[in-house]
Amino acid sequence: MLYSENIKDYYLLDAGDCEKLEVWGPYILRRPDPMAIWKKQKPELWDKADAIYHRSKTGGGYWEFKKKLPEKWHIHYKDLTFKVSPTNFKHTGIFPEQAANWDFIYDKLKDRPDAKVLNLFAYSGAATTVAASAGISEVVHVDASKGMVEWAKENRDLSN
């Protein structure tokens, strides 16, 4: 597994039994993950979750908040800032497992000021923001969801 030391404020505490337990800044979130098919390694940690996502049998799901969390907060990658906000579909707006890919993107672009990037299905703009931070001439962000495009603009603005 590739891992990036450049993502700050996020780490995986434990995973297993089709769930993952993650630290997102000051908060611990418990979310479903169908790929975590092994047994939990640290069962004593799971009760420490500040929020738990429960799947609905009819699709989607809901968050159970064990303590009051803000609607949004921030995590950092290198010197960039990204918004985190639990959504109705278990997501948080950032896929931290992509940080190794962000490292790759930055490393490939940092010495190419004439480069141009087209980021399709770009979600909340983490990769777009990383590409722009490499100092290239143009980055185009495309996502079908207007809400995600707005979220990407917010991440861009947080990182400038």
Which sequence ranges carry the predicted segments?
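N-terminal accessory targeting/assembly segments
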Residues: 1-4
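Non-catalytic substrate-recognition/targeting regions of SAM-dependent transferases
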Residues: 7-22, 29-96, 103
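Structural motif
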Residues: 27-28, 138
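Short, contiguous clusters of charged residues that form electrostatic/catalytic patches at enzyme active sites
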Residues: 96-103, 107, 150
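Conserved SAM/SAH cofactor-binding pocket of Class I
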Residues: 107-160
